[in-house]
């Protein structure tokens, strides 16, 4: 089965203070997205669509584009207000991109077949991509979706108030 991983990387990262999508985190200057693509390929994903803002492409390619493009089938799509449905009105003065659905809509011309969506600045680990791929394999060709979620209640830690009482 062919499966595409859509990687949303068009966020402004304004709280972070820079383009965290291309922040080097690995010993060889790898960015988090390279680990995502590696893990996803091992699970069976064979195509990657990276959603960026147009002005991000040059910096992205300078940091890791050649490495990624040499290891995987990579297409780029650009998140812009132009990809939004005609009936949607963007408030005057808004420059910040909208979230998940508008990002995926930006890639509608290059996303084909079964696909999964992830954030560029999160680490999912190999197991998540195996679950995603296996779930996609079980779906009919059209009309159905799935989601990989985690039970966060399994990973609770004491709150600051609990430690103050100790």
Give residue spans per PLM region.
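Conserved beta-strand scaffold positions in the cores of enzyme catalytic domains, especially
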Residues: 22, 76, 145-147
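Conserved donor-nucleotide/metal-binding helix-loop-beta segment in metal-dependent transferases, i.e.
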Residues: 128-154
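N-terminal nucleotide-binding beta1-loop-alpha1 segment
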Residues: 1-19, 23, 30
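Residue-level signal for beta-strand positions within conserved beta-sheet cores that form or flank
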Residues: 1, 18, 70-72, 143
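Feature marks short, surface-exposed loop/turn motifs that line or immediately flank catalytic pockets
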Residues: 12-13, 83-84, 154
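Single conserved hydrophobic/aromatic residue that forms the stacking wall/gate
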Residues: 155-166
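Short beta-strand segments
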Residues: 8-9, 117-119, 147-151
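Conserved N-terminal catalytic core of the sugar/cofactor nucleotidyltransferase
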Residues: 3-4, 27-117, 124-131, 138
């Amino acid at each position: 089965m062919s499966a595409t991983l859509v990687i949303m990387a068009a966020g402004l990262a304004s709280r972070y203070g820079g383009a965290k999508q291309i922040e080097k985190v690995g010993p060889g200057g790898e960015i988090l997205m390279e680990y995502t693509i590696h893990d996803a390929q091992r699970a069976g994903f064979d195509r990657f669509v990276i959603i960026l803002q147009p002005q991000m492409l040059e910096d992205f390619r300078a940091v890791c584009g050649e490495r990624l493009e040499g290891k995987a089938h990579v297409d780029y799509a650009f998140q812009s207000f132009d990809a939004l449905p005609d009936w949607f009105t963007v408030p005057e003065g808004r420059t910040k991109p909208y979230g998940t659905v508008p990002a995926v809509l930006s890639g509608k011309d290059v996303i084909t077949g079964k696909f999964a969506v992830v954030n560029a600045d999160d680490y999912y680990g190999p197991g998540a991509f195996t679950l995603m791929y296996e779930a996609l394999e079980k779906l009919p060709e059209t009309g159905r979706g799935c989601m990989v979620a985690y039970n966060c209640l399994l990973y609770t830690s004491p709150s600051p108030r609990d430690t103050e009482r100790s």
